[in-house]
UniProtKB/Swiss-Prot annotation:
Binds 1 Mg(2+) or Mn(2+) ion per subunit. One of its GO terms (biological process) is purine nucleobase biosynthetic process. This is Phosphoribosylamine--glycine ligase. SMART domains: GARS_A (SM01209), GARS_C (SM01210). Its EC number is 6.3.4.13. Disulfide bonds: none annotated. Keywords: ATP-binding, Ligase, Magnesium, Manganese, Metal-binding, Nucleotide-binding, Purine biosynthesis. ATP binds at residues 130-186. Pfam families: GARS_A (PF01071), GARS_C (PF02843), GARS_N (PF02844). Belongs to the GARS family.
Amino acid sequence: MKVLVIGSGGREHAIVDACARAGHEVLCTPGNPGIAAQARLLASPQDAPTLADLAVREGADVVIVGPEAYLAAGVVDECERRGVPAFGPSQAASRLEGDKAWSKAFMVRHGIPTAQHRSFDTLDAALSHAATQTPPIVVKDAGLKAGKGVTIAHSVAEAEAALREIFTQTGAQAVIEDFMTGQEVSILALTDGKRYALTPPSQDHKTIYEGDTGPMTGGMGVICPFPVGEEQLNIIRRDIVEKTLAGMRAEGIPFRGVLYAGLMLTPQGPKVVEFNARFGDPEAEAVLPLLESDLAQHALDAARGQLDPAQVRFRDGASAVVILAAPGYPAEPRKGIVLDIPADSPEAKVFHAGTTERDGQLVSSGGRVLAVTGLGESREDALSRAYALADCIGFVGAQLRRDIGFRIGLGGKPN
């Protein structure tokens, strides 16, 4: 099968790796130097119609769209208009991620558990409401912000500052919601709009510094599987995944692709923190190396509305991801730092997230630069292998968290 992967980050490198392991011919646009070792890179303008034309011209059997911005731009719709199966939600269905105010209203309409909230389209109304709240206050930019549009404000003044920043943008909306307590977990469902298969639960570590301190990032590391009881998993399936898929069908915008539910396991049960419309990043770098079955075939089947969940199989054991971020990230990441990356092993691999080539050298080009994945029979083994490989990488000033897995007693700190 010929597979076209769209994107250039660590998530897309993990998608390419999964498809290549299954023996497929893999193309990628725009890609990165790490992806180039496993796929043929295609230079192309990145607008939706041109990408769909590229898929036709290259004879792609299926297109897998990585980043959310491409989904919001309608790449899947354009591919389908040309008769090319594409794995991902339509532009309309991707609103589940792209418009947090709409997404919250959708959850209310369909009885999907989430935090109490209010949405605002003017700064004055948002400020008035924030002044009545007791910290911590959760403030969200309603638009796409690459996982960095959330502020957990520990004072009303901090919430007001976050709101003022959001409303510097034309047409902005903000969501203010109650702060939830509990363990956070990522649940990803591969779905054809009705049938679905869950990946192993995983847990991201979203702040830049250890102990869940510092500014929010796109994610600094993952432990997988994260321990979720069978009773809670059944509630997640019934009250969140199945209600969401049924609700999208009922509203005439069936959701195909990867439904990512970011959840809080609260004392009152699992609740949705947010939905994403694609593989998480860095969750993809954790769950896809555990996939034993054929991702490209699952993507094609889902795009055709014919997914067989029983065919989606993951290996036993565990994975761990450690992100190496540039100095200055997330505010002002330094770019152009020379990288020296050792060879992968069967149980540890480096996925390129923000790299490029300059004057014959591999250098950093983004905030999150590398994702190092370790595999093992246990979470401890996986973490040990991820850190061992990360410590062999030459990357001056790299930021990484040494406490991945600490919430479940791993990573050198108690939960």
